[in-house]
Swiss-Prot record:
Keywords, comma-separated and alphabetical: Cytoplasm, Protein biosynthesis
Native organism taxonomy: Archaea, Thermoproteota, Thermoprotei, Sulfolobales, Sulfolobaceae
PANTHER family reported in the protein's UniProt record: PEPTIDE CHAIN RELEASE FACTOR SUBUNIT 1
Gene Ontology cellular-component terms listed: cytosol; translation release factor complex
Principal subcellular localisation of the protein: cytoplasm
Protein name according to UniProt: Peptide chain release factor subunit 1
Cross-referenced SUPFAM superfamilies: L30e-like (SSF55315), N-terminal domain of eukaryotic peptide chain release factor subunit 1, ERF1 (SSF55481), Translational machinery components (SSF53137)
Presence of the UniProt keyword Protein biosynthesis in the record: yes
Length: 369
């Protein structure tokens, strides 16, 4: 039995990540193991046996038993596989302290395992998998004014706020003479220092995405001239500056509201970006629902039948859905040429999709009746 027989697709992996994020432990008893393709299984098993011997010295009985069970389960499963091929292998083993259930998940992810990693911790280490299920293209988001800034990311249909920054930069004084010039210099220095602080934070947040080639562009906006000053001066790394899309965008608000406004105003710059597509589709669904023109469809069975005859153009699914049939519909949709958009609470209409349509709604190519 090879690792390929345990392969998960992206939709299945996304559902598993969601489940594993719920697992927490009061002690370091949850085992995470990443094995890249080609790694000899005997080497991995020998390492685990050494860890098993060390774990026998843990003083607390329940912690000791939980760690030994996790390592033992991992060894048992690896001994059933002759080699690690395909994209490699990932194992998560441990006891759920809330339910007292013990489980061991072993699978081959949709992309290659990037490194060998072993750890027992209070939670499963999922960070190496999360990039596999997210859109590869990421857009940086910056809103800046004299004494406020918001830094965020646009990942697929999700807006993620990284930090909201507040400074103190007073307005210009009208005292006259040398006192005015001195105060103006102090204010200018405070303004420069604030923009410098914003730039340093932007570099810290964005450079990892730039270095791994995932940042496709950066939107820069704000209500006044600060965005122009921020762009003209070297407040950010030149590699980030080269990704700033033109023109800069006039935005009236900070925070999530401001980021949404900036994204929608940048529609022409973000052609075919998933967030824009989702917002447009949701507006179309509302329009067709209001017109009652027969171009909106909901209900699992109705959507399934319409999909099988090629009548559906796109479907929207709420990410919190735990219905296995909905997950299967989403997996099958691509085979029928249907666009699938998974939305979460960061999209304002997500709750509407969840409550009004039980988590799934579609747009038809043509009327069925």
């Amino acid at each position: 039995m090879s690792x390929d027989e345990y392969a998960l697709n992206k939709q299945e992996l996304k559902a598993l990540i969601k489940e594993l994020k719920k697992w927490k432990a009061p002690a370091t008893v949850l085992l995470s193991l990443y094995i890249p393709p080609g790694r000899p299984i005997p080497d991995v098993v020998n390492l685990l046996r050494q860890e098993y011997s060390i774990a026998q010295n843990i003083k607390l009985k329940r912690t000791r038993d939980a760690v030994l069970s996790a390592i033992g389960a991992a060894i048992d499963r690896l001994n059933k596989i002759p080699k690690i091929d395909g994209n490699g292998l990932v194992l998560f083993c441990g006891e759920n302290f809330d339910t007292e259930d013990f489980k061991c998940f072993m699978f081959s992810p949709p992309d290659k395992v990037p490194l060998f990693f072993y750890r027992t911790d209070k939670e499963f280490h999922l960070e190496f998998l999360e990039d596999m299920v997210e859109d590869t293209a990421v857009y940086g988001l910056i809103i800046v004014e004299r004494d406020e800034a918001t830094i965020g990311l646009l990942k697929g249909a999700r807006i993620e706020i990284l930090e909201e920054i507040e400074g103190f930069v007073p307005g210009k004084h009208m005292m006259g003479g040398q006192s005015q010039r001195r105060i103006d210099r102090i204010i200018d220095e405070m303004y420069h220092n604030f923009l410098k602080e914003v730039g340093e934070k932007v570099n810290a947040y964005f450079m990892p995405f730039v270095q791994n080639g995932k940042m496709k562009g950066v939107l820069l906006g704000g209500p006044g001239y600060a965005k122009e000053d921020f762009y003209k001066e070297d407040y950010v790394d030149y590699r980030i500056k080269n990704l700033i899309l033109q023109p800069l965008i006039d935005v009236s608000d900070q925070g999530e509201v401001g980021l949404r406004e900036m994204i929608m105003k940048a529609e022409d710059l973000l052609k075919n970006q998933q967030y824009i597509e989702v917002e447009k589709l949701l507006e179309e669904l509302k329009y067709h629902l209001a017109k009652d023109d027969g171009l909106i469809i909901y209900g699992k069975e109705q959507i399934k039948k319409a999909m099988e005859i090629g009548a559906i153009e796109a479907i929207v699914i709420h990410e919190d859905s735990t219905d296995k049939e909905l997950e299967k519909l989403a997996q099958d949709a691509e085979n029928y040429g249907v666009k699938v958009f998974v939305v979460g609470d960061e999209v304002p209409e997500a709750e509407w999709v969840k409550k009004t349509f039980n988590g799934i709604v579609g747009k038809l190519r043509y009327r069925l009746y």
